[in-house]
């Protein structure tokens, strides 16, 4: 792990985003809150937050940093759900890996909650895919 003891503390923010592509009927079930496992977006918000908080446990060279804020937002389109996670900290190292982890966790959870609606006759997922996970913005401000 990189030694950050000599680095200055800075206010840091990172935003990441990604999408899951789903059948239109699945999107309708999400909007109408008719998914068997519960409210997909609210559960995914919690899962994303948990993933952000546990990034250092999943990625061995990430530092355990003090997360001061997590905002998980959803944009539900006609055939996709876009997840956007913005995280903040005041620390010696960036928070972009936590933002990516937040997005990834939320997207994976969406898939888990709706997979029964997405499977075809053979049990596969021909229309379901997660893509576009990336850091949209990273800011660092001296304190």
From Swiss-Prot:
Keywords, alphabetical: Lyase, Molybdenum cofactor biosynthesis
GO terms for biological process, alphabetical: Mo-molybdopterin cofactor biosynthetic process
Pathway(s) the chain acts in: Cofactor biosynthesis; molybdopterin biosynthesis
Annotated substrate binding sites: 61-63, 97-98
Cystine pairings recorded for this chain: none
Superkingdom: Archaea
Gene Ontology terms for molecular function: cyclic pyranopterin monophosphate synthase activity
Keyword check for Lyase: yes
Pfam families per record: MoaC
Catalysed reaction, written as an equation: (8S)-3',8-cyclo-7,8-dihydroguanosine 5'-triphosphate = cyclic pyranopterin phosphate + diphosphate
Active site: 112
Enzyme's top EC category: lyase
EC number: 4.6.1.17
Annotated function: Catalyzes the conversion of (8S)-3',8-cyclo-7,8-dihydroguanosine 5'-triphosphate to cyclic pyranopterin monophosphate (cPMP).
Subunit organization: Homohexamer; trimer of dimers.
Family affiliation: Belongs to the MoaC family.
Record-given protein name: Probable cyclic pyranopterin monophosphate synthase
Gene transcribed to yield this protein: moaC
